């Protein structure tokens, strides 16, 4: 992929996670791998910049996706309560949509002067608010 990206002066965008900023018990393997993506973003941006290849990372907060819905993760009352609790720890009071993440990715694809960036698109989840 490096040869193609160099030829096209392309862009590589990783998807990280707020699990690298907030501790969610039981998510250690997921958090570790997503955290590694942020470091990889910066290292690859430094290594590939001279070839005009941009490398960035988007860090979403909670996002309601079709995969969640198809898996039935929000079908029962307990699941609906989890969804409400998740929304309450975002500063904007709701979880995000796939389109909002796509818009951030679109920005990074077009932003020719941006590389090595870790863009938090998390509705304020990374601020550390609680639902007390």
Where are these regions (language model features)?
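A short helix-coil junction within the Rossmann-fold of NAD(P)-dependent oxidoreductases
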Residues: 1-9, 111
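Alpha-helical segment proximal to the catalytic Tyr-Lys
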Residues: 3, 46-50
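Residue(s) in the substrate-gating loop at a strand-loop-helix junction
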Residues: 17
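Short, flexible catalytic-loop segment of classical short-chain dehydrogenase/reductase
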Residues: 21, 59-71
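Active-site loop immediately N-terminal to the catalytic Tyr-X3-Lys motif
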Residues: 22-28, 50-51, 93
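Active-site helix of classical SDR
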Residues: 33
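Short, small/polar-rich loop/turn modules that mediate ligand/substrate recognition or access, typified
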Residues: 49, 54, 115-116
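C-terminal substrate-recognition "lid" of short-chain dehydrogenase/reductases
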Residues: 94-121, 126
């Amino acid at each position: 992929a490096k040869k193609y990206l160099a030829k096209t002066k392309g862009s590589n965008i990783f998807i990280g996670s707020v699990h690298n900023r907030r501790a969610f018990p039981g998510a250690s393997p997921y958090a570790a791998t997503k955290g590694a993506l942020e470091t990889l973003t910066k290292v690859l941006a430094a290594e590939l910049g001279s070839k005009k290849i941009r490398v960035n990372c988007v860090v979403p907060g909670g996002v309601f996706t079709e995969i969640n819905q198809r898996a039935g993760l929000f079908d029962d009352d307990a699941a609906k309560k989890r969804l409400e609790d998740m929304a309450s720890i975002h500063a904007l009071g709701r979880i995000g949509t796939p389109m909002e993440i796509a818009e951030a990715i679109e920005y990074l694809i077009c932003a020719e002067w941006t590389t090595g960036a870790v863009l938090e698109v998390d509705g304020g989840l990374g601020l550390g608010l609680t639902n007390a």
